[in-house]
Amino acid sequence: IVQGALRSGSWVGRADILRKVVAPSGLGAWSYEAVDTKLARETKGGTVLQLCLYSELIGDIQGLMPEFAHVVPPWSEFVPERYRLADFGAYYRQVKGGMAASFASRDPQETYPEPVTHCDICVWSTSCEKQRRDDDHLCLVAGISSLQIAELKEHGVATGTQLAELALPLPWKPERGSLESFARIREQARVQLESRLAGELKFELLAPVPGFGLTCLPEPDAGDIFFDFEGDSFVGEHGLEYLHGFHYFEDGEAHYEGLWALDREAEKTAFETFIDFVIARLETYPNLHVYHYGGYEPGALKRLMGRYATREDELDRLLRGKVLVDLLSVVRHAVRAGVESYSIKKLEPLFGYERDAKLPDVNQALTRLQLCLEGNDPTGIEAEDSATVEIYNRDDCVSTRYLRDWLEIQRQTLIEQGIDIPRPEIIDGAPSENISEWLE
């Protein structure tokens, strides 16, 4: 039975599959067990709890509690993972009882659309987002955690404005987290409030700390590269980095290259081409760096190296020499801006970058393109969608360069105020003699 609707009392569920098994029940010489299909490669605790509820509902209907429940993860040749329900029963009953008690003691009017991971795919997300924004919800403060929100509410701080106006030092000792972390989110809320009241994006520079922020900015070099990946984690068993984009200057002229990879062989080739380009460019510009925004790109490079067992020494050289520079890490320790998220797109008003690709068009193109990739139909990708996604990728690469240049201006501003901001040490990426001898 596919998408079987289940109900018992006030509890309802809809299992992906009810599988008939040989076990006598009130239905006859057979009974049913729940099977759920998931996109996640690792089964999470919430999935097991979900299956426990389905199984309990099935048990009420057929007069026999199923012994097992099953999960079909992606790329498993449709072989289910089996979970013995008795192993999780006690915990399930505790969680279910706690939830029921919570609902029984709460006025239905007191429910509130707190942000959760399901918001990303929920049809009510727009309405809930509007309510949170109308209410100046604390979740709109960049970098705040749910634990911090809970503790702030315990002390009567329920909105971003109240947090922005909270006296420092904090008038209480946090039960969870440090005083510094609460001071940090208070200051973040203050800058966001100032930006809203001024009608423009405000920012302030943080005091430099050795090893963080602006002290991690290397000397700009004519050979510097700015790169960004577009990937889809649901293509095949391991995902696909389908566009490797990088931006650089040659003879004073700006260049962008987008290496498309719509299958495994092309992905390997694109990875090798990019690494070879960087290594060859190092011969001409030995002090170049490769800039990116966030940790995705270095992680993707390592995955590709491991997946295809290629360019290990070359990537090792780049990592040892700290050639890769994460500007998100620099920003987090150097700038406090009146934004709700430190996405590079939210920061672009600071450094004056205007995108060529319109984000609504990009979102639609990405959706269509990735559906083709996930459906193993790369030939179905429209040329217009590919062009839109490539412009979007180029925007990300060029925006990263604009951000680096803007950070250099802020660094110089502090230096002119008499603040010392050293450059990071230049490191030779070659392996040590001991490692070289061991490898030989």
Q: Where are each of the predicted segments found?
A:
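Conserved DEDDh/DEDDy metal-dependent 3′-5′ exonuclease domain
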Residues: 1-23, 27-102, 246-248, 256-366, ...
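Catalytic cores of nuclease domains that cleave nucleic-acid phosphodiester backbones
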Residues: 1-37, 194-245, 274
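Acidic, Mg2+-coordinating catalytic module of metal-dependent nucleases/exonucleases
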Residues: 69-135, 146, 155, 339, ...
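Short, structured interface segments
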Residues: 118-132, 192-208
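Compact, charge-rich alpha-helical regulatory domains located at protein termini
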Residues: 133-201
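Generic recognition of flexible, low-complexity loop/linker segments
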Residues: 139, 149, 211-216, 230-234, ...
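Phosphate-binding active sites in nucleotide-utilizing proteins
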Residues: 151-152, 157-167, 223-225, 229-238, ...
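Accessory interdomain/linker segments of ATP-dependent helicases and helicase-like nucleic-acid enzymes
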Residues: 420-440
